[in-house]
Regions:
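Small/polar-rich, solvent-exposed N-terminal microdomains that initiate assembly or binding
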Residues: 1-63, 92, 97-107, 136-192
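Residues embedded in well-ordered secondary-structure elements
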Residues: 43, 61, 120, 197-199
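Short active-site-adjacent helix-start/loop capping segments
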Residues: 61-64, 80-82
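Oligomerization/assembly interface segments of phage tail-like spikes and tubes
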Residues: 65-78, 124-136, 200-212
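Long, acidic/polar, low-complexity amphipathic helices and coiled-coil-like
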Residues: 67-69, 82-84, 88-91, 95-124, ...
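Short intrinsically disordered coil segments
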Residues: 69-72, 88, 143-149, 199-201
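Short, conserved charged micro-motifs
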Residues: 80-85, 141, 212
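An N-terminal amphipathic alpha-helical segment
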Residues: 190-200
Length: 212
């Protein structure tokens, strides 16, 4: 599954959201990027609110050190007061979880902001949450590899944790239950040493992140 499919799976499997959202084709009303038309048979003539629409923008934000942004918009009619509960459920569902798309680096999301507004011409409220998408790309490079050495050492002393690059990761890891370590090369520079006519010396700084 790709990242969008993982997010859909995570949201649609949440029991709290299942009880609060409208249904479409027998499933919670959660959609990627756009809603089906109001006349679609999947609504089965029932209410179309509350519902959720999410989208992913994989544009790097260097200022926030993020690989992109996840937007989750929640819609309810103006007579409903459930939107706050839906917001809480979405946050709880997406926070403290590592997601591993097939063939890609693992990702986490971190809540950044929430904006509220009314839909013009409709009796509908919307709350849109923005999450920073944090990517944990593989950092291994040379042989012998200092990043791999640090990662292997951490796994040795904390075998109950997951160390990215050492352990195989499934679709989801709930980091509140299983802490995750991520090692990366933060800095690398030439330095001096003996036998410099035959040996190149480097000094490096390795950053260790604990995701929990």
């Amino acid at each position: 599954m790709n990242l969008s499919e993982l997010i859909f799976k995570r949201l649609s499997a949440d029991e709290n959201l299942q009880t609060m959202l409208a249904t479409y084709a027998g499933a919670p009303a959660i959609f990627d990027s756009e809603f089906p038309a109001d006349q679609q048979e999947g609504w089965e003539g029932a209410t179309q609110y509350p519902r959720i629409c999410y989208r992913i923008d994989m544009q790097v934000n260097q200022e926030r050190s993020s690989a992109g942004t996840l937007y989750v918009a929640m819609y309810t009619d103006k007579t409903s007061t459930i939107i706050e509960d839906i917001e809480t459920a979405v946050k709880h569902c997406l926070q403290d979880v590592l997601m591993k798309p097939a063939g890609e680096a693992p990702f986490c999301v971190a809540w950044a902001r929430t904006e509220s507004y009314a839909i013009e011409g409709k009796e509908v409220w919307c709350k849109e949450m923005a999450f920073d998408i944090l990517e944990y790309s593989e950092q291994f490079s040379t042989d012998p590899d200092p990043v791999l050495a640090v990662a292997a050492y951490i796994k040795k002393i904390f075998p109950e944790t997951i160390v990215l690059g050492i352990d195989n990761v499934g679709d989801f890891v709930e980091t509140s239950k299983t802490p995750v370590f991520y090692c990366r090369l933060a800095h690398l520079a030439h330095t001096t040493g003996h036998c410099m006519n035959t040996i190149s010396w480097f000094i490096g700084k390795i950053a260790v992140h604990l995701i929990y």
